[in-house]
Amino acid sequence: MQRPYIESKTFEKADIRDYEDCTFNSCDLSNLNLSGFNFTECEFIRCNMSMAKLSDTTFNEVKFAECKLVALHFEDCNEFLFSVSFDQCQLTLSSFYKRKLKNT
């Protein structure tokens, strides 16, 4: 899969932190600052989000499948509507302190 190439585009006052009903497939999001991002009804498949910053990040009805999620601090996420599910994910050293995990 090739990386998307964006050329001659102007983004002005763009808020690119809100994602709804999106699928992220084989994306490398490791070490990114995802603080304040909002993911609603999204799916991450075979993605690497290891060591990303998640301060006030919203995960609402988000599914992770076969993802590498090492050393994430889910307790830093926005608690309101926090709902995630995991299928065959690597969660080594990730923390869910005081997070309610339904069906997990």
Task: Enumerate the predicted regions with their spans.
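Tandem repeat scaffolds
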Residues: M1-T104
